[in-house]
């Protein structure tokens, strides 16, 4: 698709706005159906018919902080939402197998690659940290789980603190208490004498991909699942503890904010880029709060999974 440059309701083929697009260009039909937010700058509209735009990227623009914002057609968003539902159910269904893999290999006396994979998977399923490709570390010093170094691990007698700067220069901090099952394996893996050494020095992107492949999911699926799992846990906790309970709308907004803080997003990104909409629609029901208040978290999670699964099957 050809990128066209937008200014004051007009389209141009160049970013100096010297060469206007003809009035019969199909992109103008698209503009009749969408509203481009006035606060966006450097807006690019993609040349396509309205029918094509329903399933594609329509336009991109920069917000006040210089971040590029992407706007898609209705059908694309519906397909993306349905995909998130499927990912949530798929990962839930393999979590027992993943935990079995962790339990089997984390008991090893050596710190071989399988031991490191077990610690990696335990950390990922606890904190849902971004993968951390080597190219991003080299290009902009963005750190993820695979590119953690010993210097990012601070050890004390009662806890271990993991600190690093991730995507979009967001600072992350995770605390592992001594009572947590991750504490001893992480302590065993960390070498204070080599601060620049990678924590997972026997792993590579290929080894992690091969490991995760056996479960029929992708590493990024764990993060999608994790955001929704964290939201559900926070929602369940809020229903149990917040008094008086706010309206479902306010409760959802509070829970999304809490979830975003845990995973290192803004609330809007958590909701737009990761949340399964079937889950959001489910918890909007005021009568559902009574069900939540009477269940354990595992029971609540099972109810949600069954509902999402029935929605995807339908």
From Swiss-Prot:
The induction annotation reads: Expressed in the late phase of the viral replicative cycle.
Query: Which residues are the active-site ones?
Result: 274
- Which terms under GO biological process does the entry name? DNA topological change
Domain spans labelled Topo IB-type catalytic = 77-314
The record's subcellular location field reads: Virion
Query: Quick check: keyword Transit peptide in the entry?
Result: no
Molecular function (Gene Ontology), one example: DNA binding
Q: EC number(s) for this protein?
A: 5.6.2.1
Q: Spell out the PROSITE patterns in the cross-references.
A: TOPO_IB_1 (PS00176), TOPO_IB_2 (PS52038)
Name the SUPFAM superfamilies on file. Answer: DNA breaking-rejoining enzymes (SSF56349), DNA topoisomerase I domain (SSF55869)
Going by the UniProt record, its keywords in alphabetical order are: DNA-binding, Isomerase, Late protein, Topoisomerase, Virion
Catalysed reactions, as listed in the record: ATP-independent breakage of single-stranded DNA, followed by passage and rejoining
What domain of life does the UniProt record list for this protein's source?
Answer: Viruses
EC class (word)? isomerase
Q: Does the keyword Transcription regulation apply?
A: no
Q: What InterPro entries does UniProt report for this protein, alphabetically?
A: DNA_brk_join_enz, DNA_topo_I_N_sf, TopoI, TopoI_cat_a-hlx-sub_euk, TopoI_cat_euk, TopoI_N_vir, TopoIB_AS
An example of a Gene Ontology cellular component annotation for this protein is: virion component
Record family assignment:
Belongs to the type IB topoisomerase family.
Q: What does this protein do?
A: Releases the supercoiling and torsional tension of DNA introduced during the DNA replication and transcription by transiently cleaving and rejoining one strand of the DNA duplex. Introduces a single-strand break via transesterification at the specific target site 5'-[CT]CCTTp site in duplex DNA. The scissile phosphodiester is attacked by the catalytic tyrosine of the enzyme, resulting in the formation of a DNA-(3'-phosphotyrosyl)-enzyme intermediate and the expulsion of a 5'-OH DNA strand. The free DNA strand then undergoes passage around the unbroken strand thus removing DNA supercoils.
Q: What is this protein called?
A: DNA topoisomerase I
